[in-house]
């Protein structure tokens, strides 16, 4: 009896483990976002050569976030981080209006979404640097990134400012809700 109650208690109150792959073009703000979520403050960053991995606890979920560098020469290495990814956070610099960069961001995103190992991963797009005067709106970015074309993938775009933290937790709220909904749907299918 005691052992059964302890198992139920453990399942109710244990933290869910979720593996997140956070990618995007260089200088989009990925590392700033990671450490703002983890430490609650802005840290001085340098371009990520390789990856940073940290655990962010939020809403009884341990998000293990793999922040992988976005330089052109590093992007082919992203595929080494796909395995067991539950969700993808794609960070875009909303104020980078250079057409080639926007096209590169779209192409890289759609390449990721075409990968078999990421077929079940939810997509959260952080439209970062919304505090800058010429930042594109989420509506504009949705169109430019071709998000409306994603019919078989759960996705959400959240305006953010990594430095102030604006929008970051709203994005994690969507991700948390998605994960719990997905978990409950799986339970329902087993019956």
Swiss-Prot record:
Q: Name one GO cellular component term.
A: Golgi apparatus
Q: Give an example GO biological process.
A: vesicle-mediated transport
Note the superkingdom of the native organism: Eukaryota
Which family is it part of? Belongs to the small GTPase superfamily. Arf family.
Does the record's keyword annotation contain Protein transport? yes
Which terms does the record give in the GO molecular function aspect?
GTP binding; GTPase activity
Q: What does this protein do?
A: GTP-binding protein involved in protein trafficking; may modulate vesicle budding and uncoating within the Golgi apparatus.
UniProt xrefs under NCBIfam families: small_GTP
Q: Covalent lipidation (N-myristoyl glycine) residues?
A: 2
**PROSITE patterns assigned:** ARF
Protein name as it appears in the record: ADP-ribosylation factor
The UniProt record lists the keyword Protein transport: yes
Q: List the disulfide bonds.
A: none
> Which keywords, in A-to-Z order, does the entry hold?
ER-Golgi transport, Golgi apparatus, GTP-binding, Lipoprotein, Myristate, Nucleotide-binding, Protein transport, Transport
Compartments, as annotated in UniProt: Golgi apparatus
User: Which positions are annotated as binding GTP?
Assistant: 24-31, 67-71, 128-131
Please report the organism this UniProt entry assigns to the protein.
Giardia intestinalis (Giardia lamblia)
UniProt xrefs under InterPro entries? Arf1-5-like, P-loop_NTPase, Small_GTP-bd, Small_GTPase_ARF, Small_GTPase_ARF/SAR
SUPFAM superfamilies in the record: P-loop containing nucleoside triphosphate hydrolases (SSF52540)
